[in-house]
């Protein structure tokens, strides 16, 4: 399992973000504003008014970490400053903080996936919803870094920018079909990691090779390395066949185009709800630069799905990200990054066994517990 320590000072990394304001006009240090926002989000605050309210209630506590010489910034100041903070600089500070905090072990899965912030859409101002592409450490459920794109279709250009920010030495980087690109595969290898990429119709040559090499009957009765799982949950039964192979003749020419390609894999899923007619099988194809066993393919694919279950779900249900209607300037992106920091802290505190929402409420009520979260 990856080692996670958030002890290296968040305030130190936030203080590196340059302040865009004229020095003689500054009443509240930028690092104080950012730290206040993180703490308020940890405790469940959702908008600028609630963040200001939190600050007034916890000012003595906040002064243990920052200056706050002028007290608490107003909600108008918070909104204005967070809309104008350089999002790229804040992004860099976040990534550097996580590099200082987070050590990965050989073979650890880092899942890269995107999420649209639905609340950032503003029809009246002609602003489309922004899309955040995040790198997620599957072992302990924390975000390692993220970049913004204007829309989901831009993930192809966003992923290379995200990879530049990360320490991936020895990791297995999993990306869905949007990121199944030759340049991205090469960049992952250049970072000292291996790739596991989902293949769909956007790579027709690969998809055709899989269909030719692995018809359904061959997958179910595969004579090579295979791993089968059978799960029952609330009346639903799902059986998954996982197979892996070295590069076969169908992929021989393609292997010269995909740097480092060593393993091809297939996951076929059969699902049935109660006594209903079984659903049509779902087939997913994968290419990897790692020497994967069928069991490792199953584990890595499952860990990639944690992005939906452990990250996106937590952001939407616990931190109510999609309900947030803030979209002025760069505020939506900056506040999304504050949520990621807050969620990392909440995930990192493991002594209290409650869920994210319960941890937030406990932190809001108990300053000692909030201090424990910040000291993880």
Where would I find each of the regions flagged by the language model?
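Polybasic low-complexity intrinsically disordered regions
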Residues: 100-174, 180-193, 200
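Conserved active-site and cofactor/substrate-binding residues in soluble primary-metabolism enzymes
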Residues: 31, 46, 154, 333-336
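Dynamic "connector" segments at or just before major functional cores
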Residues: 1-112, 119-120, 134-146, 160, ...
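Basic, amphipathic alpha-helical segments enriched in Lys/Arg and hydrophobic/aromatic residues
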Residues: 300-376
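Short acidic (Asp/Glu) and glycine-rich catalytic loops that position anionic groups and cofactors
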Residues: 15, 278-282, 292-295, 314-322
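Short, conserved catalytic/metal-binding motifs centered on acidic residues
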Residues: 36, 51, 74, 111-115, ...
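Structural motif
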Residues: 23-33, 276-278, 326-334
């Amino acid at each position: 399992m990856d080692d996670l320590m958030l002890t290296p000072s968040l305030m130190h990394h936030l203080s590196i973000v340059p302040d865009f304001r004229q020095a003689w006009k500054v009443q509240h240090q930028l690092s104080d504003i950012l730290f206040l926002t993180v703490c308020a989000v940890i405790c469940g605050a959702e908008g600028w008014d609630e963040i200001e309210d939190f600050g007034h209630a916890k000012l003595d506590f906040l002064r243990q970490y920052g200056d706050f010489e002028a007290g608490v910034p107003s909600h108008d100041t918070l909104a204005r400053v967070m809309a104008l903070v350089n999002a790229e600089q804040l992004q860099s500070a976040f990534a550097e903080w996580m590099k200082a905090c987070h050590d990965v072990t050989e073979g650890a899965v880092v899942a890269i996936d995107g999420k649209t912030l639905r609340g950032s859409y503003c029809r009246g101002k002609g602003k489309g919803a922004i899309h955040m592409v995040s790198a997620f450490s599957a072992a302990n459920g924390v975000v390692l870094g993220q970049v913004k794109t204007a829309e989901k279709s831009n993930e192809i250009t966003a992923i290379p920018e995200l990879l530049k920010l990360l320490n991936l030495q020895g990791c297995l980087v999993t990306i869905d079909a949007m990121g199944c690109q030759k340049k991205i595969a090469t960049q992952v290898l250049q970072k000292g990691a291996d790739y596991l990429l989902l293949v769909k119709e956007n790579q027709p040559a690969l998809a055709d090779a899989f269909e030719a090499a692995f018809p359904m009957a061959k997958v179910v009765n595969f004579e090579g390395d295979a791993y089968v799982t059978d799960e029952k949950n609330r009346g639903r039964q799902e059986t998954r066949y996982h197979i892996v192979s070295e590069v076969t003749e169908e992929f021989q020419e393609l292997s010269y185009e995909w740097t480092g390609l060593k393993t091809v894999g297939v996951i076929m899923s059969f699902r049935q709800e109660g006594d209903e007619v079984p659903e049509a099988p779902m087939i997913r194809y994968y290419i990897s630069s790692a020497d994967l066993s069928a069991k490792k393919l199953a584990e890595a694919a499952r860990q990639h799905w944690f992005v939906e279950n452990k990250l996106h779900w937590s952001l939407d249900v616990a931190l109510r990200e999609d309900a947030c209607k803030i979209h002025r300037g760069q505020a939506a992106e900056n506040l999304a990054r504050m949520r990621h920091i807050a969620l990392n802290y909440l995930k990192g505190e493991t002594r209290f066994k409650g869920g994210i929402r319960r941890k937030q409420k406990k932190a809001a009520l108990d300053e000692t517990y909030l201090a424990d979260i910040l000291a993880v």
